[in-house]
């Protein structure tokens, strides 16, 4: 069976930029920890998953419709405008892009949506007759998991391939209810406020009792516990906004056809790639 590896490029960049020692510089004195970690992780993920197709997708710097829904969406993210260049993850993107070109792996930055939307589009369009592996630490992708779609949480030798069983055991809901679950509890990573008094266990029990978010809202007046009933009734608009922020659909144009993502293994080391693009000196 074909296997498409979708890499959340911005997520991986941040993971490597902040997870690697910050004093790694090359022969020119340029910080390269993000680039070094990114390329090494990407090559290891490819070896782990043996994909037939690969694409790396990045978030561009732009407003999107989610900000129109909620002005507070992702406002908890760092403001890089006042930081020196060596402290900004994006400063290493040119080298990462050069490495991807050398590896002949297609990549793109979003202009009017988020990379999440592209990855959802690929998963929903192509996940019925091939495996899709989404490499990201972002739990939003759990809602896309099914018998063919998996989420790879890369942590080197401790990496985890998350399936529907993982989601059910960890959160008490099936993947197709995960977006509703997250709408109820909120998402601190994206600054999405949940409903006061509703934690993971309460959210899971509500979804078990009423099926989905609309079922919960339709029956909110019948919820036995007064405080919970009032929280749901007062938070109905917030819940619908959260759902729109979190739910991923197949509603955007994709940057590449499936044929353009075909991957031809190169069997290269990280050092070989970085030397070829001039980030490291040859020995």
For each predicted feature, which ranges?
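Noncatalytic, basic helical substrate-engagement surface that gates or grips nucleic-acid strands
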Residues: 2-135, 141-161, 240-241, 247-265, ...
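Non-catalytic nucleic-acid-binding/docking modules located in mid-to-C-terminal regions
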Residues: 51-55, 105, 148, 161-283
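Acidic, divalent-metal-coordinating active-site segment for phosphoryl/phosphodiester hydrolysis
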Residues: 139-140, 201
């Amino acid at each position: 069976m074909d296997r498409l590896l979708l890499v959340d490029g911005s997520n991986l960049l941040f993971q490597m930029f902040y997870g690697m020692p910050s004093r790694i510089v090359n022969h020119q004195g340029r910080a390269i920890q993000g680039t070094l970690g990114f390329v090494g992780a990407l090559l290891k993920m490819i070896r782990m998953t043996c994909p037939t197709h690969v694409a790396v997708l990045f978030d561009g710097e732009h407003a999107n419709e989610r900000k129109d829904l909620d002005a507070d969406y992702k406002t908890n993210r760092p403001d890089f405008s006042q930081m020196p260049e060596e402290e900004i993850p994006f400063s290493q993107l040119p080298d990462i892009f050069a490495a991807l070109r050398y590896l002949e792996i297609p990549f793109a930055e979003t202009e009017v949506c988020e990379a999440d939307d592209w990855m959802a589009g690929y998963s929903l369009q192509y996940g019925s007759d091939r495996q899709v592996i989404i490499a990201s630490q972002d739990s939003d992708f759990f809602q896309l998991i099914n018998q063919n779609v998996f989420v790879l949480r890369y942590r080197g030798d401790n990496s985890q391939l998350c399936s529907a069983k993982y989601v059910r055991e960890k959160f008490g809901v099936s993947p197709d209810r995960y977006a509703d679950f997250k709408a109820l509890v909120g998402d601190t990573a994206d600054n999405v406020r949940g409903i006061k008094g509703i934690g993971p266990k309460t959210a899971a029990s509500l979804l078990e009792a009423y099926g989905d978010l609309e079922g919960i809202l339709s029956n909110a007046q019948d919820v036995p516990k007064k405080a919970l009933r009032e929280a749901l009734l007062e938070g109905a608009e917030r819940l619908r906004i959260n759902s729109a922020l979190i739910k991923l659909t197949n509603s955007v144009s994709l940057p590449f056809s499936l044929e353009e993502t075909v991957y031809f293994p190169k069997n290269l080391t990280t050092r070989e790639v970085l030397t070829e693009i001039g980030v490291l000196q040859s020995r």
